[in-house]
Design a protein with these regions (language model features):
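Long, contiguous binding/interaction regions
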Residues: 1-184
Length: 184
């Protein structure tokens, strides 16, 4: 087990404490409950549609990952078994250094730093398996997701309309996170 694939307890910017861990095959029901707890706007921003529930085939695919070409992490509060956030990548078969990215944070947990924590951990895991770029299709109105992407590394975007196509270089740290060392 590599460092980025081990469970990790994280204190969020809000002070909340969660455990980040890899998705397990038995997580399907918990993922379904998490989806059921998403508001309509969050569902639309993540899936570009508002389904009342995720289809069984989608849940099965979401819980059965190989942790190499398809990785998924979840966030679980220490005092609860329920999933409050999830992120994943799926490697592009024709571009082995690139993977499609997705992230979901329950409405009640948005704005606490959970999305940033999940994506930082997922980026570590991606780099371990040779992925240096994430791609994502994001609604142009979803400024919080675009900001999360910018926090991962340099972002190239194209916007043919209401959907922004983004490519993030996760191997290159973002400029705003670089530390400056001063010597006197």
């Amino acid at each position: 087990m590599t460092a980025a694939s081990r469970p990790q307890v994280v204190t969020l910017r809000s002070g909340d404490v969660v455990r980040l861990r890899q998705v397990r095959p038995g997580d399907g029901p918990a993922l379904a409950r998490a989806y059921a707890n998403l508001g309509e706007q969050s569902r639309y921003r993540r899936f570009f549609t508002v389904m009342p529930e995720l289809p069984e085939a989608t849940l099965k695919q979401a819980a059965e990952v190989d942790h190499e070409d398809h990785e998924a992490l979840v966030a679980v509060p220490l005092l609860s078994p329920e999933i409050v956030g999830e992120c994943r990548f799926v490697r592009w078969p024709d571009q082995p250094d690139t993977a499609e990215l997705g992230v979901t944070v329950l409405d009640a947990w948005q704005g606490r730093g959970l999305g940033s924590a999940l994506l930082a951990r997922l980026s570590e895991r991606a780099l371990e398996v040779g992925i240096g770029y994430f791609t994502a299709e994001v609604l142009a109105e979803n400024r919080s997701m675009l900001a999360l992407l910018a926090g991962l590394g340099p972002v190239e975007t194209s916007s043919p309309g209401p959907v922004v196509s983004a490519r993030v270089d996760i191997a290159e740290p973002p400029r705003q996170r670089r530390r400056i060392s001063w010597t006197c």
